[in-house]
Amino acid sequence: MAYQEPNKDGFYGKFGGRFVPETLMTAVLELEKAYRESQADPSFQEELNQLLRQYVGRETPLYYAKNLTQHIGGAKIYLKREDLNHTGAHKINNALGQVWLAKRMGKKKIIAETGAGQHGVATATAAALFNMECIIYMGEEDVKRQALNVFRMELLGAKVEAVTDGSRVLKDAVNAALRSWVANIDDTHYILGSTLGPHPFPEIVRDFQSVIGREAKQQYRDLTGQNLPDALVACVGGGSNAIGLFHPFVEDESVAMYGAEAAGLGVDTEHHAATLTKGRPGVLHGSLMDVLQDAHGQILEAFSISAGLDYPGIGPEHSHYHDIKRASYVPVTDEEALEGFQLLSRVEGIIPALESSHAIAFAVKLAKELGPEKSMIVCLSGRGDKDVVQVKDRLEADAAKKGEAHA
């Protein structure tokens, strides 16, 4: 099938669009115009490619996880190692592209939201590189959970604003960043960190992240001599690492695509972030997408052990893939993600981010189902350094509970 989403109004099927107040429409249209101009200018992409190579360290390897594959005894698992990028995750692909775009637009200041802190660190890094002022909005809860990343951002010259509204997490940080953008439109560019928000943000983020899938596609051929893998797996919060892996394969219908959503304490509890499993269409942050909401359309709080996945919506293109049945979205609990985190560390010597651990956990299940004749690419979206203390505390608490139960 020929895939040409989004349309000129920013819709992916029935999802997407730009539902923004008049005050923001000018900025959004200005951004789209600048982005189209940059797409038509070969020097923009050449400069970006050079930065991705020399500064970020791309291309990232596609690594055959032989030990993990043998441990499971199922399909061959190839890891797309986005954890090896400068700053430790896929977020830099988009941050660098957007800061470079903002610089060309003549903007002086960069603002961004962040959950786990990875997008904040990536944005602060790119702003430092281009010598631009940078303010990062972060929910107060996440500031506590990710103290190390907060210090990193400050070290890189950014100012971190703790957001105390609402549930003090990622969605509240997005609200605060959007408000700030409205107030400072002339000299400020807002860098959305995922495939969310009003058009053209989901398209821009997808395009900058699609380097993941483009590289992986070619690397898979070079490594295996085969044309295509049987499946792709990536974790999904807002969905930027997943869309980056999936989009270059979207027309290859033989390739099954799986997004691993955060099921938290379980999809039948109130503590999860499984948007496509439990959500329904609604407008959030300027875009029509699937969102977790109550009977009255009020946005519900999302919950996950992983700060980067507890967003109550999902990128509109993922909602579209789900709607047309091009991709499947599967819930993975905190507990399963913790098992994935430990398993990959133990058998491959690679400590994954808690976000990526959701993808690993589902890949283990899928590998058993597919069997040894098949193969898959899993996006290892980030490294787990930022999560080690949290996991240590959680495992120690779990062990103490078990001890009490046996006493």
Curated annotation (Swiss-Prot):
Where in the chain are disulfide-linked cysteines found?
none
**Could you tell me what reaction this enzyme catalyses?**
(1S,2R)-1-C-(indol-3-yl)glycerol 3-phosphate + L-serine = D-glyceraldehyde 3-phosphate + L-tryptophan + H2O
Gene3D superfamilies linked: 3.40.50.1100
List residues, modification N6-(pyridoxal phosphate)lysine: 91
EC numbers for this chain: 4.2.1.20
Q: Which GO terms describe its cellular component?
A: cytoplasm
Annotated membrane-spanning segments are none
What is a GO molecular function of this protein? Answer: tryptophan synthase activity
- Stored PROSITE patterns: TRP_SYNTHASE_BETA
> What pathway or pathways are given for this protein in its record?
Amino-acid biosynthesis; L-tryptophan biosynthesis; L-tryptophan from chorismate: step 5/5
Cofactors: pyridoxal 5'-phosphate
Q: Which Pfam families does the UniProt record give?
A: PALP
State the source organism's domain of life.
Answer: Bacteria
Keywords in alphabetical order: Amino-acid biosynthesis, Aromatic amino acid biosynthesis, Lyase, Pyridoxal phosphate, Tryptophan biosynthesis
- GO BP: any one term: L-tryptophan biosynthetic process
The free-text function statement in the UniProt record for this protein reads: The beta subunit is responsible for the synthesis of L-tryptophan from indole and L-serine.
Known partners and oligomeric status: Tetramer of two alpha and two beta chains.
Its family? Belongs to the TrpB family.
Protein name (record): Tryptophan synthase beta chain
Which gene codes for it?
Answer: trpB
